[in-house]
Amino acid sequence: MFIKSLQIANKDGVIRLIKFHAGLNLIVDETPVDEASTESTKTTGNNVGKTTVLMLVDFCLGADAKGIYTDPETKKGEYTLVKNFLIETEVLITLTLVEDLDDPLAKTIVIERNFLSRKKCIRRINGLQKTIEEFE
């Protein structure tokens, strides 16, 4: 299976849609360099979402949501701002997998997850809600 797309949306609409293609896919910093600035600024590639994209794919494949909003170095501190945003705006992550990226008729699996709990929890595969046990 290949990753076809990763969509991040909330109750206000699509936040980000990342489409993948055959071959090497890169996440790069496309921040424009401010040539008018007198300060020496450099495009670093920091904070463009490389690790977050990987964590969201992992989350869709069954990982714990805490990995998204917990400090990756200490594994203890929570980023409350991030956690609250994910819950309060009802963020939904949709991962689309396909057997063949070049075949529009290829078998497709759509996995959807959100960060809500209990009855509001979304844990779907091809539109069917799954229990935690079934999802794993």
What are these regions (language model features)?
Residues 1-109:
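Extreme N-terminal "head/tail" segments of very large remodeling/mechanoenzyme assemblies
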Residues 112-136:
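Glycine-rich phosphate-binding loops of NTPases
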